[in-house]
């Protein structure tokens, strides 16, 4: 009998620990979602075409710039394996290989993010069901730490941060484009990637604030609920005492 009770207790402890792990997956899901969203958010680039005066800088028309940028984004986000072939601009073998590597990286991130989507949903349900709202505060803090920590190297030397990023995620230096052989790089200036990084950090800050807002609201509702239960228990106690007397 004791063995059965202990087994049930151990199983419950394991499930609770597993559930807590799903809560910790929420910040990862938010970060990956923010990265994928910004990569696919073409209006930011359209804004930069004018803001960075790319037509004058590159000598290409606005339509050509947008068309080739759209191709790069669509190619990288598409799960279908096709040959990389820009509509208007030539590409070197190294350039083609790099975009294939980017596509592979993004496709892996998308698959991983689907996994974190389900674990995050479970984590949110677990947090609300068990009324462990302090987990939402923890999620908020963890998300907020990312922009805080990344903003420092970005502000000090964004190019160096950009270089470190490529060295971490790519095994070669094919990302170092020569505009003579890969003119696509001329329409993808460093400033655009900086704006994209800032956009990601802003989104993360907003998500952090949203989770903290939920934490405060749910915590307050829990206090109200506990207060109501205590008042009801007090009334029942008083009623019971009167009945005995």
What is the role of each PLM region?
Residues 2-45:
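Hydrophobic secretory-pathway targeting helix
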Residues 39-57, 166:
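Alpha-helical transmembrane signal-anchor/signal-peptide segments
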Residues 77-116, 191-200:
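Individual transmembrane alpha-helix segments
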Residues 172-192:
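Short, membrane-exposed interhelical loops at transmembrane-helix boundaries
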């Amino acid at each position: 009998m004791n063995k059965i009770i202990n087994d049930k207790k151990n199983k419950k402890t394991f499930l609770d620990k597993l559930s807590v792990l799903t809560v910790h997956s929420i910040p990862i899901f938010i970060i990956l979602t923010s990265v994928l969203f910004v990569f696919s958010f073409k209006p930011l680039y359209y804004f930069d075409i004018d803001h960075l005066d790319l037509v004058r800088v590159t000598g290409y028309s606005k339509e050509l710039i947008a068309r080739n940028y759209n191709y790069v984004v669509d190619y990288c986000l598409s799960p279908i394996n096709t040959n990389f072939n820009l509509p208007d601009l030539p590409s070197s073998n190294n350039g083609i290989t790099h975009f294939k590597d980017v596509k592979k990286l993004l496709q892996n991130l998308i698959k991983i993010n689907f996994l974190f989507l389900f674990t995050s949903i479970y984590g949110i349900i677990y947090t609300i069901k068990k009324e462990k709202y302090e987990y939402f505060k923890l999620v908020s803090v963890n998300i907020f730490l990312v922009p805080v920590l990344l903003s420092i190297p970005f502000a000090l030397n964004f190019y160096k941060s950009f270089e470190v990023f490529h060295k971490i995620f790519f095994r070669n230096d094919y990302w170092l484009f020569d505009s003579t052989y890969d003119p696509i790089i001329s329409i993808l200036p460093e400033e655009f990637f900086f704006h994209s990084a800032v956009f990601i950090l802003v989104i993360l800050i907003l998500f952090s604030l949203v989770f903290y807002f939920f934490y405060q609201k749910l915590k307050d509702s829990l206090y109200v609920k506990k207060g109501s239960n205590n008042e009801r228990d007090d009334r029942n106690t008083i009623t019971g005492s009167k009945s005995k007397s």
